[in-house]
């Protein structure tokens, strides 16, 4: 599945690919506070590329899924998921990131509780 509508948030979700690098870069820059805290560096195009490409060396790229969440045609969130990591049958959520204007409103918790990720 590459597109999912989450009506109760007016979000659209889709799997992100390299073509969305500019939008993901914009989100990473908007979330610089998070990246400063976690990685001691600002969000950037490099950060966006890492979200799309980096994974454990023994994990095929086909086992990495990056969901993007859009609201009003703007990328406002991302979820990075690794399938069969750290071992077969396990799904690992390595990042759930929302733009600053959406934080603190329960969106992350509601997305998690809605089991959006089960629709993959």
Q: What does each model-identified segment do?
A:
Residues 102, 106-114:
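Conserved acetyl-CoA pyrophosphate-binding loop and the N-cap/start of the following alpha-helix
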Residues 32-54:
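Conserved GNAT-fold acetyl-CoA-binding loop/helix
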Residues 1-19:
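Conserved N-terminal entry element of GNAT/NAT acetyltransferase domains
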Residues 53-67:
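A short helix-loop-beta-strand connector motif used in the catalytic cores of GNAT acetyltransferases and
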Residues 24-25:
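Hydrophobic pocket/interface hotspot
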Residues 18, 72-74, 86-88:
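Short strand-connecting beta-turns/loops that link adjacent beta-strands
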Residues 68, 74-83, 92, 97:
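Conserved beta-strand in the GNAT
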């Amino acid at each position: 599945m590459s597109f999912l509508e989450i009506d109760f948030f007016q979000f659209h979700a889709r799997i992100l690919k390299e073509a969305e690098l500019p939008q993901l870069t914009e989100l990473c820059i908007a979330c610089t506070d998070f990246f400063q805290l976690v990685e001691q560096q600002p969000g950037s195009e490099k950060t966006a590329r890492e979200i799309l490409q980096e994974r454990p060396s023994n994990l095929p790229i086909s086992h990495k899924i990056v969901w993007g969440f859009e609201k009003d045609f703007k990328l406002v969130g991302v979820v990075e998921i690794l399938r069969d990591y750290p071992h077969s049958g396990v799904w690992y959520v390595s990042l759930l990131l929302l733009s600053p204007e959406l934080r603190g409103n329960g969106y992350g918790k509601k997305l998690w509780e809605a089991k959006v990720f089960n629709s993959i």
